[in-house]
Amino acid sequence: MPTALITGASAGLGAEFARQLAAKGADLVLVARGTDALNVLAGELRTQHGVAVEVLAADLGQESDVTRVAERIADAGHPIDLLVNNAGFGLPLQFADNDIEDEVRHLRVHVEASMRLMHAGIRAMRGRGGRIINVASVAGFISRSTYSACKSWLIGFSRWANAEYSRDGVSVTAVCPGFTHTSFHARMGLSPGHEGVPGPMWLDAADVVREGLRDAARGKSVSIPSLRYKVIVALSRVLPSSLTAGVARRGRV
């Protein structure tokens, strides 16, 4: 059976990727900082789907932990067929108001860790084939502080890597959701209903993951789940940035 390694797997989109992949029969390696939620999810998936689930506790803001995850990806004896780079977090304040160390950690998790794990994944997969999904954001198409900058990098690098390594059997897809019902905003201190986001703009995590997996299977370099956000991205290319920046003001759109 194929094996998928998912970072940020304890909740939100990461957990939903795990559920949908397990339902398809994939064995899993679940990565997140804490093991309690991972162990609960792992038990659920083993029971419901009969798949093998490995739990790997790692803080992707720490270089040593990123190295451990990269080594697991590189393990030829237990190959990874699909890497889902999903780990990430938002910061509650504007750039100048955040502690600079928080901003640096934010950059490490979103960009450096994703790059290191992609490097390990591509090296392990090229020739035999494999797939990488980078969970980016619609915010990557809209100028807004470091969150958008990180996601923009991830989108651009995914596009290049997909074109470069598809000839070696490795596809790379940036999945770019808009506002999605997960615990992301709550971890930023925004309680449900107080995110400042109109109801019609919210997406369901299951729909985001379903469309992302479908687009990745088709070899697309960028996946933008839902028609409404496809329209927003199209408009962002032609409208002044001052009009589109507000769409991303809460971080993960």
Annotated model-derived regions:
Residues 10-11:
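Conserved glycine-rich cofactor-binding loop
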Residues 24-41:
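Conserved glycine-rich Rossmann-like NAD(P)H-binding loop of the short-chain dehydrogenase/reductase
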Residues 86-91:
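Conserved NAD(P)H cofactor-binding loop of Rossmann-fold oxidoreductase domains
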Residues 94-96, 102-107:
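Substrate-binding pocket helix/loop in short-chain dehydrogenase/reductase
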Residues 118, 150-153:
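Active-site helix of classical SDR
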Residues 137:
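Residue(s) in the substrate-gating loop at a strand-loop-helix junction
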Residues 174, 195-232:
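C-terminal helical subdomain
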